[in-house]
């Protein structure tokens, strides 16, 4: 009798443990995390590398959304205390500005791995870098008699007739205008920090203005190039690579490109901060970053990832040594300090 009761107790104990484990797993699966990124080919790669694997690992459901980087939407949520986004993908100037304005949670780098295993600049007070991208010059190789070599060629409508695509904003657009005007990449922000440099950039844009078609979403440049609406465009390298995979005959000019990390940030006041940090840690592993870079050629930030990637993939990354020749890192601090005034001036100029 005692043996029988002992057996029942043992079975009951095991069933209880199983029930607790099942309940914990069910609770994890019932948790959802809203992750907002820039959409398009990048979001598709994130789905394969991060969102779906995170769900399969039991981390919780990922509700994926997209935006065009409008910090006003984040600010509105934080200001009224109704935060519906948990994790957002942001560019470095917006990360620094948003951190200063209290829009993002402070993050502890120790939660995401050994900092020595990541490229410099991965960890910020309010963000963790997820990949490195480049703003490049792209063109349709079937529509030009010869290949353009520089932003000076981009401005040369006599030898390269046709419309040009440029991002509708001061950031990146003022930089390429100065590069087209002969400013060296290493002197770019030193010149742009002066009133004379700013006037020089806008004067250069005046020359091209009748031939410019402005884009606001990253998907537009490859679409316009493929349709023949423009013959050259500033574009995100990953968007051009996605079009190339589909058989569109687009080419990239790497010298004069502008590269920058993209970051994950956690929106201030989210009730899911712990889950958000868990997701970011998951997305910061070499294996998950490998899958991402195989889907879209953006540079990984974990140093251990490169050894896992085929050579052909490594050569297409913005961080490949050959692609960094003549390239310039975006100066995020410059845009934090001068962004508002330059965007206002740009908007007034574009409206004329």
Curated annotation (Swiss-Prot):
<keyword id="KW-0732">Signal</keyword>
<dbReference type="GO" id="GO:0030976">
    <property type="term" value="F:thiamine pyrophosphate binding"/>
</dbReference>
<dbReference type="Pfam" id="PF13416">
    <property type="entry name" value="SBP_bac_8"/>
</dbReference>
<dbReference type="GO" id="GO:0015888">
    <property type="term" value="P:thiamine transport"/>
</dbReference>
<keyword id="KW-0574">Periplasm</keyword>
<comment type="similarity">
    <text>Belongs to the bacterial solute-binding protein 1 family.</text>
</comment>
<comment type="function">
    <text>Binds specifically gamma-aminobutyric acid (GABA) with nanomolar affinity. Does not bind structurally related compounds such as 4-aminovaleric acid, spermidine, histamine and butyric acid.</text>
</comment>
<keyword id="KW-0813">Transport</keyword>
<dbReference type="GO" id="GO:0030975">
    <property type="term" value="F:thiamine binding"/>
</dbReference>
<dbReference type="GO" id="GO:0030288">
    <property type="term" value="C:outer membrane-bounded periplasmic space"/>
</dbReference>
<protein>
    <recommendedName>
        <fullName>Gamma-aminobutyric acid-binding protein</fullName>
    </recommendedName>
</protein>
<dbReference type="InterPro" id="IPR006059">
    <property type="entry name" value="SBP"/>
</dbReference>
<feature type="signal peptide">
    <location>
        <begin position="1"/>
        <end position="28"/>
    </location>
</feature>
């Amino acid at each position: 009798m005692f043996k029988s009761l002992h057996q029942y107790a043992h079975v009951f104990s095991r069933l209880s443990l199983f029930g607790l484990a099942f309940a914990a797993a069910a609770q994890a699966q019932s948790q959802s995390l809203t992750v907002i990124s820039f959409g398009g080919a990048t979001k598709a790669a994130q789905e394969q590398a991060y969102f779906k694997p995170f769900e399969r690992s039991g981390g919780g459901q990922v509700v994926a959304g997209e935006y065009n980087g409008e910090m006003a939407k984040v600010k509105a949520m934080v200001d009224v205390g109704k935060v519906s986004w948990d994790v957002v993908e942001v560019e470095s100037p917006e990360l620094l500005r948003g951190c200063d304005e209290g829009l993002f949670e402070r993050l502890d780098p120790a939660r995401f791995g050994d900092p020595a295993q990541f490229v410099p600049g991965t960890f910020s007070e309010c963000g963790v870098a997820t990949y490195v991208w480049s703003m490049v010059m792209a063109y349709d190789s079937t529509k030009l008699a010869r290949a353009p070599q520089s932003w000076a060629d981009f401005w040369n409508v006599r030898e390269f007739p046709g419309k040009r695509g440029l991002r509708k904003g001061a950031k990146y657009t003022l930089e390429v205008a100065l590069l087209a005007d002969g400013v060296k990449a290493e002197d770019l922000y030193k010149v742009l920090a002066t009133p004379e440099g700013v006037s020089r950039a806008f004067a250069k844009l005046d020359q091209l203005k009748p031939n410019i078609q402005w884009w606001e979403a990253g998907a537009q440049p490859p679409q316009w190039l493929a349709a023949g609406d423009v013959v050259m465009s500033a574009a995100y390298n990953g968007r051009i690579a996605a079009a190339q995979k589909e058989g569109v005959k687009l080419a990239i000019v790497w010298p004069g490109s502008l590269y920058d990390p993209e970051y994950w940030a956690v929106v201030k006041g989210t009730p899911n901060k712990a889950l958000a940090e868990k997701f970011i840690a998951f997305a910061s592993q070499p294996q998950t970053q490998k899958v991402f870079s195989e889907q879209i050629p953006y540079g990984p930030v974990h140093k251990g990832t490169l050894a896992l990637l085929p050579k052909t993939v490594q050569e297409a990354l913005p961080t490949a040594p050959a692609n960094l020749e003549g390239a310039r890192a975006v100066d995020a601090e410059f845009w934090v300090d001068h962004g508002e005034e330059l965007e206002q001036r740009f908007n007034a100029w574009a409206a004329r």
